[in-house]
């Protein structure tokens, strides 16, 4: 009982002492979110609505008509999720993309084909927070997102299936009746079954782009043919003439075309081109 009375006395003393203490005053209690508006730099304010508007402007202004480019335009027209950007800026996966694209000229493909300058310029502006009035942060993010997706899909589809559709390109070179101005039929010069990039392949590649295996998948799309590897090594030589480099580039592209291989021994005849193998 004595212990209980003692504890009760202590609690009563502490309670009375606490009641006599002055209330704690917080110096920032009057600050609201509106009070922070003066600290906000509008130059760095990201607007999802503005980013979408700029992406729509880029895709509508695009004159590219390849299957990959049309796929990308439909992807953003349907309001699908962004792959390379978010409200914090650019994803680190863009660095992996740039790293792989930086070596594309070793494959006899120009960096212009994969919008390398647009991507690196936009990425640099975001990292340095260096924006211009006519290219603000929202435009820069939109440019990075749009061109990164086009570049990525152009690269993986081009390295796997070829950057040129041989049937579409070669079968529109010669007219059947060149002297007849009314004739619109072309002579068939390429009639070999060749694999083509499809929506399923691009869907699977976009899933890889949003994951950590991005760089690995990009490198896995490279042609493994030993003849292609030999041509690639020759293309890296510094003593080649322009004509030699062009010839190597054309043959490297031909090895990218995926043609079905027969089982065992077989004869392959390209009738339109009169080639017997």
Task: Locate predicted features.
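Auxiliary tRNA-acceptor-end handling modules of aminoacyl-tRNA synthetases
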Residues: 20-277
């Amino acid at each position: 009982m004595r212990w209980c009375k003692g504890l009760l006395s202590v609690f009563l003393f502490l309670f009375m002492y606490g009641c006599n203490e002055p209330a704690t005053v917080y110096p920032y209690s009057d600050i609201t979110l509106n009070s922070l508006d003066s600290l906000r730099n509008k130059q760095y304010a990201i607007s999802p609505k503005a980013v979408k508007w700029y992406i729509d402007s880029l895709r509508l202004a695009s004159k590219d008509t390849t299957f990959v480019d049309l796929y990308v335009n439909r992807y953003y027209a349907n309001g699908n999720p962004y792959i390379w950007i978010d409200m914090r800026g650019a994803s680190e996966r863009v660095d992996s993309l740039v790293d792989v694209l930086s070596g594309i000229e070793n494959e006899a493909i120009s960096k212009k084909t994969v919008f390398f300058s647009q991507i690196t310029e936009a990425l640099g502006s975001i990292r340095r927070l260096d924006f211009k009035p006519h290219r603000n942060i929202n435009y820069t993010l939109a440019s990075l997102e749009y061109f990164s997706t086009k570049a990525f899909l152009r690269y993986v589809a081009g390295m796997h299936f070829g950057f040129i559709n041989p049937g579409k390109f070669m079968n529109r070179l010669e007219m059947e009746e060149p002297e007849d101005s009314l004739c619109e039929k072309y002579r068939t010069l390429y009639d070999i079954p060749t694999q083509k990039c499809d929506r399923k392949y691009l869907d699977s590649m976009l899933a890889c782009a949003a994951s950590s295996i991005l760089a690995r998948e990009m490198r896995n799309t490279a042609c493994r043919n030993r003849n292609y590897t030999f041509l690639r090594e020759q293309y890296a030589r510094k003593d080649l003439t322009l004509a030699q480099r062009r010839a190597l580039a054309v043959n490297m592209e031909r090895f990218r075309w995926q043609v079905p291989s027969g089982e065992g021994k077989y004869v392959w005849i390209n009738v339109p081109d009169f080639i017997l193998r």
